[in-house]
């Protein structure tokens, strides 16, 4: 019921199998992570996945944004899998997560151009959780680019017509 804490709800269904649980709220792909088991269930709460804090997925989610960018800056090999798997790219939108990852290696020069390549990202997480063979963070890089665009009050100026990928 609404207002019940996640801890109470999970204990009512059999409890935890691990000593240090972490919650993924809203699904693994687009959901958020919480370590607060006493957070109340709200009307908008959806799926809950309980994993131990030492689980690989949780460790990736706990990595600070600065570390994610540093890893992406040094390890992205520009394989383009993140772009080729992107559902928005396949629909014909000019979303290029691989190019946004490339921009991590640059200084602030040209940020307006690189940010545009992330502006139509739907943040589904497919690139980060499935497509990238290096286990990098293209979704998070796109999220950061979109946040920078919002902060600078920029709008997407890309093409207005789309042509679906012939796949």
Residue ranges and their predicted role:
Residues 1-134, 139-167:
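Redox cofactor-anchoring modules in respiratory/redox and cofactor-processing assemblies
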């Amino acid at each position: 019921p609404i207002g019940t804490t996640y801890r109470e709800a999970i204990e009512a269904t059999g409890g935890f199998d691990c000593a240090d649980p972490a919650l993924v709220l809203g699904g693994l792909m687009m959901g958020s992570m919480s370590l607060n088991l006493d957070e109340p269930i709200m009307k908008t709460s959806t799926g809950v996945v309980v994993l131990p804090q030492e689980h690989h997925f949780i460790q990736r989610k706990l990595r600070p944004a600065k570390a994610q960018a540093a890893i992406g800056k040094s390890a992205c090999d520009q394989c383009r899998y993140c772009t080729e798997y992107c559902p928005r790219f396949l629909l014909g939108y000019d979303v290029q997560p691989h190019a946004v990852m490339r921009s991590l290696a640059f200084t602030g020069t040209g940020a307006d151009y690189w940010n545009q390549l992330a502006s139509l990202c739907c943040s589904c997480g497919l690139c980060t959780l499935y497509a990238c063979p290096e286990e990098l963070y293209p979704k998070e890089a796109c999220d950061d680019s979109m946040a920078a665009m919002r902060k600078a009050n920029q709008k997407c100026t890309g093409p207005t017509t789309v042509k679906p990928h012939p796949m």
